[in-house]
Amino acid sequence: MLNFLNFYSVPLAELEVGKHLYWQIGNLKLHGQVFLTSWFVIGVLVLASVAASSNVKRIPSGIQNLLEYALEFIRDLAKNQIGEKEYRPWVPFVGTLFLFIFVSNWSGALVPFKLIHLPEGELTAPTSDINTTVALALLTSLAYFYAGFSKKGLGYFGNYVQPVSFMLPFKIIEDFTKPLSLSFRLFGNILADELVVGVLVLLVPLFVPLPVMALGLFTSAIQALIFATLAAAYIGEAMEDHHGEEHEEHH
């Protein structure tokens, strides 16, 4: 019985969170496996874009049809969250976020990264690393600050005392909680999904984890949609003109 337990304790230990392939660049210590899988995801997106645009047809088919559908979906999402007048410049940013997160999430389930052995750690979805999700959340924060300042200038700070002045500390705290919630929600969901599927694959036959993997693909797509939707909503909120709305209501 002891030998049986020891047999299963070895592979389960390999699922330990925190093992990384480190790259030392000067004084910086980088997570190498995150860069490798991120470059893979970027390469997939670039190849798909080139394939879709190299031979454009009036009646789209194949990869062109798929990417045109994705573009229309992202454009509608941005229009609904940001507004019809302001959304167009932000479609590339929101679309890049959505597609990168979507492909990253799915790569962890569909690409056999586990077959590639590294000196330390293992290859997983880029979004299962907190550094990736924090970087995406900080980019979103910079984007909505830029959106607000580009439209309102210093008047953007007026949002911090709307509708009443004592909202100022709560609005400042909100600026910190937005990237925190974005990053930890995405990181937690993707990491948990990979760990659950990994444990099930070790403990039970192949076909038993398949429903869990299918559910993981669905939730991964939903997480990409949630992140992109919230990013667009924050940008729209930063550019929202409260004074303009009040003026229209009086008329």
From Swiss-Prot:
One cellular component term (GO) for this entry is: proton-transporting ATP synthase complex
Q: Where in the cell is it found?
A: Cellular thylakoid membrane
User: SUPFAM superfamilies per the record?
Assistant: F1F0 ATP synthase subunit A (SSF81336)
- Reading the lineage from the top rank, the first entry is Bacteria
- Which cysteines are disulphide-bonded? none
**Which keywords are on file for this protein?**
ATP synthesis, CF(0), Hydrogen ion transport, Ion transport, Membrane, Thylakoid, Transmembrane, Transmembrane helix, Transport
Gene Ontology MF, one: proton-transporting ATP synthase activity, rotational mechanism
Q: Does the keyword Ion transport apply?
A: yes
On subunit structure and binding partners, the annotation says: F-type ATPases have 2 components, CF(1) - the catalytic core - and CF(0) - the membrane proton channel. CF(1) has five subunits: alpha(3), beta(3), gamma(1), delta(1), epsilon(1). CF(0) has four main subunits: a, b, b' and c.
Give the family per the record. Belongs to the ATPase A chain family.
Please state what the protein is called: ATP synthase subunit a
The organism named in the record is Nostoc sp. (strain PCC 7120 / SAG 25.82 / UTEX 2576)
> What broad taxonomic lineage does this protein's source fall under?
Bacteria, Bacillati, Cyanobacteriota, Cyanophyceae, Nostocales
